[in-house]
């Protein structure tokens, strides 16, 4: 297992953009910034992945849907990205104190930080191995949920765990299979809706998939989300099933 500390942050301009994206007012910026600073006090963003020699080919992961035979011949790397346990503890503290606005702001800010973490992790892989990340395949999206088991088994770490419903702890964690390429023009910046590369075939496919949706950025109060966001917010069938079982 290889572990890399990720160096991520949000500038004030990026925070202002996020503030607008999540439908806050300019007057909310001071509180939004204070929550961001609180998160960054103890956040420990890290990326974990199998060694290059242990990298799986796509066909070794159980595939469905959009994973084609041609893509199955490309090299890939199992990856876990996490912000650590502090954001979970902070949100719990906010909730216990009835600070629901701060808790919701923390959720929004952590989404932005995870998008940054994807980008930084992709860059670290390129620096270390000379391979660029072409596409990210997520269990429960492009891969079946059961692919989570092989990703975790290949990496062999204990900081992030999953339960029988494949819900991750710490919650601000994501597991995926990074498909690699040597071609610079095929490199993926991150989740499609945050990427400026409008010519990217991955983005065009994503836009076609969601072309009937009005907004690219999610309303996390209940709207169905594109899969990259579902993984961050854990909105998958397994998590829903777990909640239903607890309520019965």
Regions of interest found by a model, annotated:
Residues 72-138:
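Conserved mixed alpha/beta catalytic, RNA-binding, or beta-rich assembly cores of soluble enzyme
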Residues 1-98, 102, 214-241, 247-248:
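Active-site helix-to-loop segments that bind/position phosphate- or nucleotide-bearing substrates
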Residues 30, 34, 112, 116, ...:
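Conserved active-site and cofactor/substrate-binding residues in soluble primary-metabolism enzymes
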Residues 41, 45-52, 119, 131, ...:
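Intrinsically disordered or highly flexible coil/loop and linker segments, enriched in small
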Residues 17, 34-41, 108, 123, ...:
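Charged/polar, solvent-exposed surface patches and flexible loops
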Residues 132-204, 216-248:
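Short terminal or interdomain "cap/linker" segment that borders an active site or interface and mediates
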Residues 206-213:
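Composition- and surface-driven signal marking solvent-exposed, interaction-prone regions
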Residues 58, 108-110, 188:
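Generic recognition of cysteine residues
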């Amino acid at each position: 297992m290889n572990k890399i500390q990720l160096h991520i942050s949000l500038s004030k301009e990026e925070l202002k953009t996020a503030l607008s994206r999540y439908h806050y007012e300019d007057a909310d910026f001071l509180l939004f910034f204070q929550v961001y600073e609180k998160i960054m006090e103890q956040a420990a963003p890290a990326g974990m992945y199998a060694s290059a020699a242990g990298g799986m080919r796509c066909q070794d992961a159980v595939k469905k849907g959009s994973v084609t035979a041609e893509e199955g011949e490309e090299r890939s790397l199992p990856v876990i990205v996490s912000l650590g346990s502090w954001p979970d503890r902070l949100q719990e503290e906010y909730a216990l104190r009835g600070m629901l606005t701060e808790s919701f702001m923390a959720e929004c800010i952590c989404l932005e930080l995870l998008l940054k973490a994807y980008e930084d992790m992709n860059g670290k892989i390129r620096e270390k191995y000379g391979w660029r990340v072409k596409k990210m395949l997520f269990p429960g999206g492009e891969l079946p949920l059961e692919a989570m088991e092989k990703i975790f088994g290949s990496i062999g770490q204990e900081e992030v765990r999953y339960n029988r419903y494949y819900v991750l702890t710490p919650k601000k964690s994501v597991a995926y299979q990074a498909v690699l390429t040597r071609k610079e023009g095929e490199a993926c910046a991150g989740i499609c809706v945050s990427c400026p590369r409008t010519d990217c075939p991955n983005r065009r496919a994503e836009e076609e998939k969601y072309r009937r949706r009005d907004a690219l950025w999610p309303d996390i109060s209940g709207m169905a989300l594109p899969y990259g966001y579902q993984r961050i917010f854990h909105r998958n069938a397994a998590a829903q099933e777990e909640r239903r079982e607890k309520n019965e």
